Amino acid sequence: MSTLEQKLTEIISAPVEALGYELVGIEFIRGRQSTLRIYIDSDDGITVDACADVSHQVSAVLDVEDPITVAYNLEVSSPGLDRPMFTAEHYTRYLGEEVTLVLRMAMQNRRKWQGIIKAVDGEMITVTVDGKDEVFALSNIQKANLVPHF
């Protein structure tokens, strides 16, 4: 997680939790049209109204704190079926589930991996890929998503 994303998480978590939702994670995607994407969840699921409420509250806080120096779009959504994974707790919650990982730095000449989450030990996760256990540092994971099965 970048320094900006850490700061944004600190700023955003209080208003999200005050509304009764879990802040699953955030992504700040830089580009011609930069986007701040906020993922929220709750035991009862997420509605469009919930996303609108969080967007309104977070937008007000971001206007005051002003941590982002470029123009951006704010998106608030549920994690969806291909839920993004941001923390060790997320991996622990989904032990035994299939995940796709994109690494910052390649391991064994690969940046993209897919397998079953086997274990979490501090800041390291073990994923079984093609029958072999591979260990990944959370700090080297650029993006991770659950693989939905229908």
From Swiss-Prot:
Q: Does the keyword DNA repair apply?
A: no
The transmembrane residues are none
Its domain of life?
A: Bacteria
Choose any GO biological process term that the UniProt entry carries and state it.
ribosomal small subunit assembly
The subcellular location is: Cytoplasm
Mind naming one GO cellular-component term on file for this protein?
A: cytosol
Alphabetic keyword roster: Cytoplasm, Ribosome biogenesis
- Similarity annotation: Belongs to the RimP family.
Functionally, this protein is described as follows: Required for maturation of 30S ribosomal subunits.
Q: What is this protein called?
A: Ribosome maturation factor RimP
The record lists the organism as: Yersinia pestis (strain Pestoides F)
Give me the gene this protein comes from.
Answer: rimP
